[in-house]
Amino acid sequence: VSTMREVLKTLHDHYKYPVDIEFTINFSENGEFLINLLQCRPLQSKGTGIAGVKIPEVPEEKMFMKLFKNTMGGPTKMEFHTVVIVDAKGYAEMPYKENFSVANAIHAVNTYAGQNKKSLMILGPGRWGTNSAELGIPVRYAQISNVNAIFEMSFESSGLMPELSFGSHFFQDLVETNTFYGAVFEKDSSEGVKSIYRPQVLENEKEVYDEIPDTIKALRNILKVYELEESRMVLVADSKWEETVCWKEKENPKSSK
């Protein structure tokens, strides 16, 4: 696994895009192996057709996140009405079988966003689209089909780590629908510049989980669904410099100071 991860990273660095590969492995009697790369195709996302996106200077108190590399889908500028955060600690502590109910609750939020024409961002621990709930959130693509941006977050103490499965049907669906993808690491830094993640900027926004049909009440402390009313969440990604910034542009007048 570590060898293939290194191969994919090396190819990504040279192509400047994630890649889809076909390969064979031949093993010798002493356990050594040789990897033969048969095909390598760059998986280029479309972006939104914005040329020359410029990352703005954003005051830290307004910043939701700032990422360096670990994204797919730029150059782009997007705005969001609804933001969903799956609490990493709460999810990790759930009994294994109950993890699958989180996917069902997210499906309900996805349906709500589609019916009400809400632009939707979701963030959760580990891998999205995994079949193994101990590795992340076991959603099918149909359950997040109205999502505009999806982020995987690390929660190292429970082994939940971002790892988009290049070549999977789930990944292909993200590419084909131009869904923006990003990975948020607890200890991430690039060339000495640390990434930023500040969910506290949403603390005073309206939570609407209980108002959404078909959600599961027992999960209301696991899923936080924020409806931005007077505020708006803006994301700008520059694929050339591999930098992404997301911030709350207008303060909600109902928020306490």
Residue ranges and their predicted role:
Residues 1-257:
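Conserved divalent-metal-coordinating catalytic cores
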